[in-house]
């Protein structure tokens, strides 16, 4: 069985505040590995660095990455090229059209990776408010990742490693006729030993 076929059965999601940096780097890494992945933000709006610290660029979710890219170029191409924002947006627009808000999405995922505690809390609260009518379990996993280019890349690789470990355990449990949920904490423990600087929090939720 090819890697892409092995990965096609599970649905993954990555979530950060603005659906631009951490969630999109993890989205890219998982997609390139053959996973079925979507990504979202939980913030009230998309916020990116501005020309001054006290004046960030603020956009509505759904604003195309192309439009954001062109707006920043019109402000100062040199500034946004230097701080890596244009490179980030260029990556993003190759993956999908626009940043999406978690609360507007209605897809069902097996695993949701959030990149900071407030995003984790927001996802868990939203799923609880939806009422679990489908009675489908979702594994919500928070990995604290600093919001900068370098840490987004480190976090993306770490999330891919965890996705691979979870996938392998799912297939092993299906083969052996055992319950995956009985072994998920063992997977987290093994992963956390490899990545002690990326604290992990977990909660089960229901669609």
From Swiss-Prot:
GO terms for molecular function: protein serine/threonine phosphatase activity. It comes from the Eukaryota. InterPro entries: RNA_pol_II_suA. Keywords: Hydrolase, mRNA processing, Nucleus, Protein phosphatase. Its main location: nucleus. One of its GO terms (cellular component) is nucleus. Its EC number is 3.1.3.16. It catalyses: O-phospho-L-seryl-[protein] + H2O = L-seryl-[protein] + phosphate; O-phospho-L-threonyl-[protein] + H2O = L-threonyl-[protein] + phosphate. It is found in: Nucleus. Transmembrane segments: none annotated. Belongs to the SSU72 phosphatase family. Component of the cleavage and polyadenylation factor (CPF) complex, which plays a key role in polyadenylation-dependent pre-mRNA 3'-end formation and cooperates with cleavage factors including the CFIA complex and NAB4/CFIB. SSU72 is required for 3'-end formation of snoRNAs. Component of the cleavage and polyadenylation factor (CPF) complex. This is RNA polymerase II subunit A C-terminal domain phosphatase SSU72. It comes from Kluyveromyces lactis (strain ATCC 8585 / CBS 2359 / DSM 70799 / NBRC 1267 / NRRL Y-1140 / WM37). The gene is SSU72.
